[in-house]
Regions:
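Extended carbohydrate-recognition surfaces in non-catalytic/accessory domains of CAZymes
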Residues: 1-84, 137, 143-146, 158, ...
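Short flexible loop/turn segments that cap and initiate beta-strands
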Residues: 192-198, 241-245, 639, 647-649, ...
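Substrate-binding clefts and catalytic carboxylate motifs of secreted carbohydrate-active enzymes
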Residues: 4-5, 11-20, 88, 389-391, ...
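Short, hydrophobic beta-strand segments
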Residues: 115-117, 228-237, 674-679, 772-791
Length: 815
């Protein structure tokens, strides 16, 4: 099967909400050429009055049309033609040469269009994709349009179906791996054909290490699945530390010719799950150091590029993560490939809703009719990726507490096991939603009043405060989800640490994962994980900041009785990630790394002194407002709180060489010591001790006000064909290279040569700047630009300018 990107030559315009209007060419006045992937929403002007408001980050939800004219080779007239759309948000209707060819309501799933009957091999073809995204449909920033790749696939009438080759490790023992290969062959022609099905497995150097040939007689108009076994001697195993990938080639040979083939990568590894050991990979116990992520990439929106995916995974691995949860929808192919390559375990999630909608026009309006199609495509997409170890069938599903509606869980789990028996199934339960219909009476019994408000789940959790733990730990909640828990291999608990020990005793066969947890709770969660093998890991909300759910991690410095969950305009980001929007580590990520036992060196940060005496109203999704900075201009002589993170007994703080205090670590919060001192420019240093012996030190210094722009590309080249991006990292530094977080300068960007700026901005969660503006204000001293090729080869020059700074140029080769 020939597979090629189908991303070039598209024309985009807004409007055309009805298919009739779109087919009639409505809205063509504002059309523009685009190359996919393309997030149609991220460049739009945000609106404070947007109906979905904070949930969508005040970005607009609109309808879009994409059109393209293409030609096919007449020599392929006897071939089958498919199009794969890896992601279109949402309600995509596909028309080819004016005829309806197919649709997919789900905005996060990949889908296929069999275009064979609709295309011409002698005349140009027209394709139109109508995207109906004009209504609120998500609880976070969804993006819009064709935001992932489109692929054109051409194959003989006798062919392997798309994603039709599935490899699974059945056993690894005594230096030998047994690999099962299932291949689905379709024959849409006539007559009988005698063929040979061949599978070869090649090592990283391209050497064939195992193979099998199977003779097959194919009959007309059939689709059959065939199974082979191949034996690999002395296999190199895939895991987080050694992500070794083999290449497989499965092809149909007829005579001396290869009629069709599929080539891909595969990792040999075994998975085990039990109460005694917990989760094991290749026989070794693995505790999942996990984080949840959404699908946007900050300044480029939801458009998915290979380098953006690799950058995210690499950054998270460097911060100590070994697992990510794709929340709350199927992970992109690019991200799966990055996780395979770099060694990151994945919990891939089906959906945020089943049949009960959370937003008026979300996937819940289609799930009952489309779930089998979408689950099947999820599993087919994931099957050969060794990184995927868990499938989650849902997130915070209210139906899980209803004895009739919870049967959807059984349907989903059974379907996944039918399609893939080599992985484990979980369900990410929020017990507050599972018992929502019982909450008024439970709250009345607890003295809250039977008319207490029950509404949007995150706001409700915030308003209930400490009472939520008691409700979650109650027998009523446990009984409500008992059947749902029995349907899966691992029960996922969202914000239910209070059940871990209780359920471990009550249910001797239950295995638990913290599928979504408060970032501030990792210290106590990890202690339980290390104590009880049946708790296999923790996935914090979130590993990476994201657009939408604006302000859930903010700290409010004003006196207020409001327990408002979201922040008002101009907030656009959640501001709750270990990594900020542009991928820089925030202090909490170092605290997390220390808890995991992966960092020996202490870490110093400071809370903004301008808010020292203000109230600190925090949500559950924040731990601190500390910044790694000793630049607080205008706050000289004012009190300041310094935080020291360390796995040690004591910490001593020095300001400009003078000892402030020596105190125990963990008195208020495990692995943290808080110091009160007075801000003086210069340097602040922490020295930590175990058993009275110094074990490490860390310091931060004041950068001078005479800052310059420092910029560098994170790689020296970018594909000329527009298929990927390269990041340019920008920082405001003094002559000694020290970052000045106070330097909120406006920095302009321009580009010369064969490239374009695909997104530019900072991590500011409340910036009003558009990511396609040419000027952006540095936030905490940093910015990031994404550079994309424009189809030509040559040298791209990115120029950065700011008042009082020398111009800086960065060169990137488009190859």
């Amino acid at each position: 099967m020939r597979k090629e990107k189908f991303n070039h030559g598209w024309v985009f315009h807004k409007g055309g909400g009805s298919s009739l209007e779109a087919l009639a060419g409505g809205g063509t006045a504002n059309e523009q050429p685009v190359t996919l992937p393309h997030d149609a929403s991220v460049g739009m002007t945000r609106n404070p009055d947007e109906p979905n408001g904070s949930g969508n980050g005040f970005f607009r939800e609109e309808c879009y049309n994409y059109t393209k004219t293409f030609s096919l080779n007449p020599e392929d007239a006897d071939k089958n033609i498919w199009l794969e759309f890896e992601g279109v948000y949402q309600n995509a209707f596909v028309y080819i040469n004016g005829s309806y060819a197919g649709k997919c309501p789900y905005g996060y799933g990949n889908f296929y269009i069999d275009a064979t009957r609709y295309v011409s091999f002698t005349e140009p073809n027209d394709i139109k994709v109508i995207v109906k995204n004009g209504v609120p449909s998500g609880r976070w920033y969804t993006g819009g349009g064709i935001y992932r790749d489109v692929n054109l696939m051409i194959a003989d009438r006798l062919h392997l179906i798309p994603d039709g080759v599935q490899l699974a490790t059945q056993e690894v023992e005594d230096g030998q791996a047994i690999i099962r290969v299932r291949s689905t062959i379709e024959y849409t022609g006539i007559g009988v054909r005698d063929i040979m099905l061949v599978t070869e497995l090649m090592d990283a150097d391209g050497n064939v290490v195992a193979s099998d040939e199977m003779p097959i007689t194919t009959e007309e108009h059939t689709k059959q699945t065939y199974q082979q076994k191949i034996y690999v001697e002395n296999p190199s195993l895939w895991d987080e530390d050694h992500p070794y990938l083999y290449t497989y080639r499965t092809y149909i040979r007829e005579g001396e010719n290869a009629v069709d083939e599929e080539i891909g990568t595969f990792g040999i590894r075994t998975l085990q799950l039990d109460r005694k050991h917990g989760f094991r990979v290749n026989g070794k116990v693995v505790n999942l150091r996990g984080g949840c992520i959404h699908h946007d990439n900050g300044v480029t929106g939801t458009a998915e590029f290979p380098h953006a995916a690799e950058f995210r995974v690499k950054t998270l691995k460097e911060a100590g993560y070994n697992a990510i949860r794709s929340s709350h929808y199927p992970m992109s192919r690019r991200l799966l490939e990055a996780c395979d390559k770099l060694g990151m375990y994945v919990m891939d999630e089906f959906a945020d809703v089943w049949t009960t909608t959370k937003v008026d026009f979300d996937y819940g309006t289609h799930m009952a009719e489309w779930w089998e199609h979408d689950v099947s495509n999820l599993v087919r997409k994931d099957y050969n990726h060794p990184c995927v170890v868990l499938y989650s069938i849902g997130n915070e599903i209210p139906e899980t507490g209803n004895k009739f509606d919870s049967q959807w869980g059984k349907k989903l789990a059974d379907k996944i096991r039918e399609l893939d028996d080599a992985r484990f199934v979980t369900n990410s339960l929020n017990l507050m939603l599972s018992i929502m219909d019982r909450l008024p009476k439970m709250m009345a019994a607890a003295g809250q009043g039977e008319n207490a408000e029950v509404g949007e789940i995150n706001s409700m959790m915030t308003s209930l405060g400490d009472m939520m733990g008691a409700l979650i730990a109650s027998d009523v909640a446990g009984d409500a989800i008992a059947e749902s828990a029995s349907q899966v291999d691992v029960i996922g608990y969202n914000y239910a640490t209070d059940r871990y020990e209780k359920d471990g005793e009550k249910y001797p066969n239950r295995i638990i994962v913290g599928s979504e947890t408060y970032p501030q709770d990792l210290d106590k969660n990890w202690e339980l994980i290390e104590k009880y093998p049946y708790i296999i890991g923790d996935f914090s909300w979130t590993a990476w900041d994201y657009l939408g759910e604006a302000g859930i991690g903010k700290i409010n410095y004003e006196e207020t009785n409001s327990m408002s969950f979201y922040a008002p305009y101009p907030y656009k980001a959640a501001y709750c990630g270990d990594m900020n929007l542009i991928g820089d580590r925030r202090p909490i990520s170092y605290w997390r790394e220390i808890i995991w036992g992966l960092r020996d060196k202490p870490y110093v940060s400071a809370q903004p002194p301008q808010h020292h005496d203000d109230p600190h109203n925090m949500t559950f999704w924040s731990l601190t407002d500390a910044v790694r900075s000793w630049n607080w201009k205008g706050c000289e002589g004012k009190p300041i709180t310094v935080e020291v993170y360390a796995d040690a007994d004591e910490a001593e703080l020095f300001v400009n060489g003078k000892s402030v205090e020596r105190k125990k670590i963990g008195e208020k919060k495990k692995f943290i010591a808080y110091f009160e001192t007075t801000y003086e420019p210069g340097e602040v240093e922490a020295v930590v001790y175990k058993n009275g012996v110094e074990t490490g030190r860390d310091k931060i210094v004041t950068a001078s006000d005479d800052v310059q722009i420092k910029a560098c590309a994170d790689r020296g080249c970018v594909p000329a064909d527009e298929s990927d991006i390269t990041y340019v990292e920008i920082a405001m530094v003094d002559a000694n290279g020290n970052l000045n977080t106070d330097a909120a300068k406006d920095v302009s960007v321009s580009i010369e040569g064969p490239g374009v700026i695909a997104g530019y901005g900072s991590a500011d969660p409340a910036s009003e700047e558009n990511y396609f503006d040419t000027t952006a204000k540095a936030y905490e001293g940093r910015l990031r630009a994404a550079v994309r090729g424009n189809g030509e080869k040559g040298t791209i020059t990115v120029t950065l300018k700011a008042d009082g700074c020398q111009d800086v140029q960065v060169q990137i080769e488009a190859k």
